[in-house]
């Protein structure tokens, strides 16, 4: 099949993104957001199923129902918090869900979810010394860290008994309000763009394929995980026939990185190690041949769904496509142009064949038959005598 760019419904992308951001979904409390994604897929005529652990899977069938497939992986869970302790002053001590700095939590408005499903308590994260008129310069001199902040509850409460009367207890989930904003210049500012912007891009790509009446060359599975931020990610739920996995997640826009907010990113490696040589270069070729603005990058303090998949034993090539995000896990910002480039690349990838459609039909094969695209293909005559590099 010859690949062709598809029409991207940017209004749909924007709407889905804003609606996703409006649904609180810290890791461990993701039922609502998964229901939303399932409803969006159902509206496209794509059925979905849910695993015991909450991951959602769906499928765009290719022309064949056997052999090797591919998978796109995103996650709907976000960083957040949990009530660790009720404090004597009527405030709450927090434990983080996921890895993020208290520096970006100070001043954040939050929702506290009690076991009473009809009651959500609001509050705000504040430093322990929050009053400038009381502490003066000590406000700036206090440390930065979760031990230096607390949640002020928006109810008339001054002690532990008052908190318990509100139904608040240790283990209650605390969601940080995203405060999304789309600017006239196309920037999207919000907490939790990681990875809800990725989910919106993937849903938009699937919509473009369905609207165009295109049958993917290879059966394409979608796996929406709910524990990426706490390290489990795609450790389960992948179809055993999957030969290629592409994770879609936030790319790092910061000094020393090549990612941009207005472009898609191809990660060549992250904190776990390099991604698959052949799959990454195939994605780069697709982007280059079809005018997708794609930059390559390598991340240091980074881990994604595919790391969990590989560690769980997935027999698949893995890659990571991203949308550039400034201030990741903080006051995040990306751009609609970058999301559009990412969505288009996903549309093209869904139309393409596997890197090695015949060889990857099985999890393993004969070394001599491997059609390597690398610069050092296997020598069919066998290993040379003596140390490598010495004639």
Q: What spans do the regions from the language model cover?
A:
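N-terminal hydrophobic/helix-forming segments and targeting peptides
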Residues: 1-391
């Amino acid at each position: 099949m010859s690949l062709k760019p598809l029409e991207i419904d940017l209004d749909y992308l924007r709407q889905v993104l804003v609606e996703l951001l409006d649904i609180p979904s810290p890791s461990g409390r993701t039922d609502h957001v998964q229901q939303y994604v399932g409803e969006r897929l159902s509206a496209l005529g794509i059925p979905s199923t849910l695993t015991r652990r909450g991951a959602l899977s769906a499928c765009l069938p290719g022309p064949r129902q056997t052999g090797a497939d591919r998978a796109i992986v995103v996650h709907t869970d976000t960083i957040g918090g949990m009530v660790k302790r009720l404090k004597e002053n009527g405030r709450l001590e927090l434990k983080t869900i996921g890895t993020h700095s208290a520096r970006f939590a100070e001043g954040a408005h939050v929702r506290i979810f009690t076991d009473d499903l009809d009651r959500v308590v609001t509050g705000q994260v504040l430093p322990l010394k929050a009053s400038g008129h009381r502490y003066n310069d000590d406000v700036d001199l206090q440390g930065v860290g979760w031990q230096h902040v607390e949640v002020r509850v928006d109810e008339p409460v001054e002690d532990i008994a008052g908190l318990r009367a509100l139904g608040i207890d240790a283990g209650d989930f605390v969601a940080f309000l995203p405060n999304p904003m789309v600017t006239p210049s196309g920037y999207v500012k919000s907490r939790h763009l990681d990875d809800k912007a990725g989910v919106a891009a993937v849903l938009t790509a699937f919509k473009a394929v369905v609207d165009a009446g295109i049958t993917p060359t290879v059966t394409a599975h979608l796996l929406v995980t709910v524990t990426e931020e706490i390290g489990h990610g795609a450790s389960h739920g992948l179809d055993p026939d999957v030969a290629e996995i592409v994770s879609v997640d936030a790319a790092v826009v910061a000094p020393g990185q090549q990612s941009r907010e207005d472009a898609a990113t191809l990660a060549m490696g992250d904190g776990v190690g390099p991604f698959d040589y052949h799959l990454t270069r195939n994605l780069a070729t697709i982007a280059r041949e079809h005018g997708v603005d794609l930059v390559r990058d390598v991340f240091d303090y980074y881990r994604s769904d595919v790391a969990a998949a590989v560690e769980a034993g997935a027999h698949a090539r893995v890659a990571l496509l991203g949308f550039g995000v400034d201030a990741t896990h903080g006051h995040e910002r990306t751009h609609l142009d970058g999301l559009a480039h990412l969505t288009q690349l996903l549309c093209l990838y869904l139309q393409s064949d596997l890197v090695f459609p015949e060889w990857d039909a099985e999890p393993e094969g004969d070394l001599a038959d491997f059609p390597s695209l690398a610069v050092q293909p296997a020598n069919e005559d066998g290993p040379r005598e003596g140390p490598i590099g010495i004639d």
